[in-house]
């Protein structure tokens, strides 16, 4: 697993967001996902770059996955990447408790960082947003990428709020997307 400083040095490169394939019956196609990650890693090895790979971002359809499906996708990604590039797992959920649970799991299986959107159904106040990320930071040793996406979260984290957030979380925040 990378240190936060090493991750910070890689997040200003290309961020590859993996897609999650599904079977026609709606079940996650884990074998297809594994193939996709292997293909991506092979191309990165052929053409080395400063980059990260993110499972379970928006392109990975994270809101449509169960917690167990999200965890399995993250585990497979970390396993297949095998340290070739940093894995920044998408771990955002509709609640702080579930976000922390998925994020702790991602850390436990070897993800280098997490990418986290605000809870997206009941949008928190500014104080709630600060508390959400502070609670998450307190639970993790790995770096956090703040996914500032008002189209999906219903809220925009303004620069002054981001400054306060960085003060609250120490060096845990490695980037903002």
Regions found by a protein language model. Give the residues of each.
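Active-site/ligand-binding-proximal alpha/beta "capping" segment
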Residues: 161-177
């Amino acid at each position: 697993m990378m240190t936060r400083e090493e991750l910070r040095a890689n997040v200003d490169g290309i961020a590859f967001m993996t897609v999650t394939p599904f079977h026609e019956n709606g079940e996650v196609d884990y074998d297809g996902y594994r193939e996709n990650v292997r293909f991506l890693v092979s191309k990165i090895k052929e053409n080395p770059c400063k980059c990260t790979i993110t499972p379970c971002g928006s392109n990975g359809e994270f809101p449509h996955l169960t917690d167990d499906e999200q965890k399995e996708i993250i585990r497979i990604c970390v396993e297949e990447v095998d340290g070739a590039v940093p894995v920044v797992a998408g771990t955002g959920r509709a609640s702080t408790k579930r976000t922390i649970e998925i994020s702790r799991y991602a850390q436990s299986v070897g993800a280098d960082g997490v990418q986290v959107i605000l809870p997206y159904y009941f949008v928190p106040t500014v104080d709630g947003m600060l508390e959400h990320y502070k609670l998450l930071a307190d639970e993790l040793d790995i770096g956090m990428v703040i996914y500032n996406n008002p189209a999906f979260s219903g809220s925009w984290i303004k620069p002054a709020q981001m400054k306060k957030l960085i003060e609250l979380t120490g060096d845990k925040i490695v980037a903002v997307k």
